[in-house]
């Protein structure tokens, strides 16, 4: 008796093309799914064109072509209130982390993303473990990459700044920002109490550059997009405080302004060249609804 593995079994919904278009454009017009989810289905080899898997975004479709879209996904067996799998292949996994969970084990806390993913890999009979290549603070939410083998981990770590070409965060900061956009650059260094502080001149720390763009504002708060040119510890939180508009809910660098009872920082865009296939990988999550609600 052959037992079907729910991890690999796929079922498809079938469509017929009625007007010529590039594949991604056609999928976005005909599937009631977000752009990130459609791209993930493509990259997960969940789309078939004329009975063969297609991953090319600009694959040309002609009138009469048959398109099959997978209805089941590898992460159907995955359930976690803290972690959402956005994309997965044999080399890596992209997840969206909730607040309240560490990126990896630290101290006596057993709740961390690596442990959650390792448990998922065991349940789905994958012979791999999650390898940490970058981190988000416990109370920062958003997109992260985990490698599934040591070789992919090393490729990502050794060439991180060339592989990852766009990382953007969104934050609710205290007060009304004076400028619509700009750049802040200085040196960041930890003191003996592990508090990161900045200096306009070289203080022996690491040079940090953050670009910002205001998306919305009220007298009380501003919704700000941050794009990292460097990725230093606590960079956005320190730079926000330097501008006089700390991230809301920031106990360490904030001013007590805590309208949502959480650190209002979310990693919402992550774009990189796949370390093995070299394909451009672009992921974007919605700005948290609770952030948007403050500006209605």
Task: Walk through the language-model features, giving the residues of each.
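RNA pseudouridine synthases
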Residues: 1-296
């Amino acid at each position: 008796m052959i037992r079907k593995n729910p991890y690999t079994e796929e079922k498809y919904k079938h469509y017929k093309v009625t007007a010529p278009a590039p594949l991604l454009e056609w999928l976005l017009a005909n599937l009631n799914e977000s752009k990130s989810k459609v791209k993930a289905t493509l990259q997960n080899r969940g789309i078939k064109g004329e009975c063969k898997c297609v991953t090319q975004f600009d694959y040309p479709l002609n009138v009469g072509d048959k398109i099959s879209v997978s209805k089941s996904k590898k992460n159907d067996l995955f359930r976690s209130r803290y972690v959402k799998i956005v994309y997965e292949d044999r080399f890596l996994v992209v997840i969206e982390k909730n607040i309240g969970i560490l990126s990896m084990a630290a101290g006596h806390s057993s709740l961390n993303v690596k442990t959650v993913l390792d448990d998922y890999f065991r349940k789905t009979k994958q012979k791999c473990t999650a390898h940490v290549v970058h981190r988000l603070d416990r109370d920062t939410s958003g997109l992260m990459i985990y490698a599934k083998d040591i070789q992919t981990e090393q490729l990502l770590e050794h060439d991180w700044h060339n592989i990852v070409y766009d990382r953007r965060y969104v934050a609710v900061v205290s007060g009304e920002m004076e400028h619509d956009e700009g750049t802040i650059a200085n040196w960041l260094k930890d003191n003996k109490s592990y508090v990161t502080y900045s200096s306009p001149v070289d203080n022996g720390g690491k040079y940090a550059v953050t670009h910002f763009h205001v998306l919305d504002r009220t007298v009380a708060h501003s919704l700000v997009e941050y794009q990292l040119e460097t990725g230093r510890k606590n960079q956005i939180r320190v730079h926000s405080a330097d501008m006089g508009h700390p991230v809301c809910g920031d106990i360490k660098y904030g001013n007590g302004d805590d309208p949502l009872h959480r650190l209002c920082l979310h990693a919402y865009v992550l774009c990189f060249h796949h370390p093995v296939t070299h394909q451009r990988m672009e992921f974007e999550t919605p700005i948290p609804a609770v952030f948007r609600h403050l500006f209605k």
